[in-house]
């Protein structure tokens, strides 16, 4: 009887020990499985992150490529710039290398109109077509009805300097001068204004061009010739578009003018635009 009881107790302890061992194995299995799953999830998450990053890198690369294409649209073509003064060529070349714009400021009276169909607007469009968008930044400062003396009195040099010009293409308002006081002092006043402009807009290259021809004038052409001499003697580039106009002593000039002693008509702006375009964009 005692022997059977001992056997039962032994079996009980054996089963208890076995159940403890099974429990330990179960816990170990659960922990191991959880660790394995966590690792698998972590690996999967890591791969997803890499894929996302790769896509992002491709997108950035595409953006950079697009930026290069945009930059490539604006470039310095030495063949186009061969007519320009060396100083201006260097400015254009450096601007292209630095991916910046050359600030060209066109100054004048109604002859250098800021209107859409005027020569200045046509030149702006042609510069963009040839050199690409962004290399030339063109601003037109049209001082309607202001004589050369009034440009000085109104301190227009300081206003122009605010545009931070690299190049200034100045058309002294000789037609306006003629209508107000005559052209007797036009060249002397031009000299004063150009000197003021040189001081206010330090570093800018100043180029001079005449107003358009007018019909049947006597003294006005002499003043224009004196302007050309002033520019040449003082080493200012003179953009002489007069050679492309019809003979102003004949009525053949009239279709190119708004009135006999006036500013350019649409046809006048077209031939003026063609000349300055050929100057800035050599063929």
Feature annotation, model-predicted:
Residues 95-182:
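Conserved SGNH/GDSL esterase-like catalytic core that processes O-acyl groups on lipids
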Residues 2-102, 281-283:
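N-terminal secretory targeting modules
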Residues 183-194, 221-225:
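Charged helix-capping and loop-helix junction motifs
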Residues 137-139, 205, 235-237:
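Conserved beta-strand segments of alpha/beta enzyme cores
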Residues 128-132, 165, 173, 195-202, ...:
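Sec-exported extracytoplasmic/periplasmic mature domains
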Residues 87-91, 149-161, 188-196:
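Alpha-helical scaffolding within the catalytic cores
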Residues 171-172, 196-228:
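Active-site segments of SGNH/GDSL-like serine hydrolases
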Residues 216-283:
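Catalytic His-Asp segment of secreted/periplasmic serine-dependent ester chemistry enzymes
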């Amino acid at each position: 009887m005692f022997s059977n009881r001992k056997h039962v107790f032994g079996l009980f302890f054996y089963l208890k020990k076995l159940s403890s061992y099974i429990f330990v194995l179960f816990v170990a299995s659960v922990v191991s499985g959880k660790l394995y799953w966590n690792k698998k999830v972590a690996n999967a998450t890591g791969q997803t992150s890499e894929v996302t990053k790769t896509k992002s890198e491709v997108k950035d690369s595409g953006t950079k490529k697009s930026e290069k294409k945009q930059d490539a649209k604006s470039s310095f073509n030495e063949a186009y710039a061969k007519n320009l003064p060396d100083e201006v060529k260097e400015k254009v070349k450096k601007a292209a290398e630095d991916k910046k714009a050359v600030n060209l400021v066109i100054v004048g009276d109604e002859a250098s109109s800021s209107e859409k169909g005027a020569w200045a607007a046509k030149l702006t469009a042609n510069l963009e077509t040839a050199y690409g968008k962004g290399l030339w930044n063109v601003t037109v400062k049209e001082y309607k009805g202001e004589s050369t003396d009034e440009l000085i009195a109104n301190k227009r040099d300081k206003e122009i300097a605010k545009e931070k010009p690299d190049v200034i293409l100045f058309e002294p308002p000789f037609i306006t001068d003629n209508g107000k006081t005559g052209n007797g002092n036009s060249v002397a006043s031009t000299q004063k204004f150009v000197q003021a402009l040189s001081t206010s807009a330090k570093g800018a290259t100043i180029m001079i061009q005449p107003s358009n021809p007018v019909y049947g004038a006597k003294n006005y052409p002499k003043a224009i010739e004196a302007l050309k001499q002033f520019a040449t003697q003082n080493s200012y580039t003179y953009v002489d578009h007069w050679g492309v106009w019809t003979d102003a002593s004949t009525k053949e000039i009239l279709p190119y003018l708004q009135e006999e002693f006036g500013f350019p008509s649409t046809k006048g702006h077209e031939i003026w635009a063609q000349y300055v375009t050929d100057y800035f964009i050599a063929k």
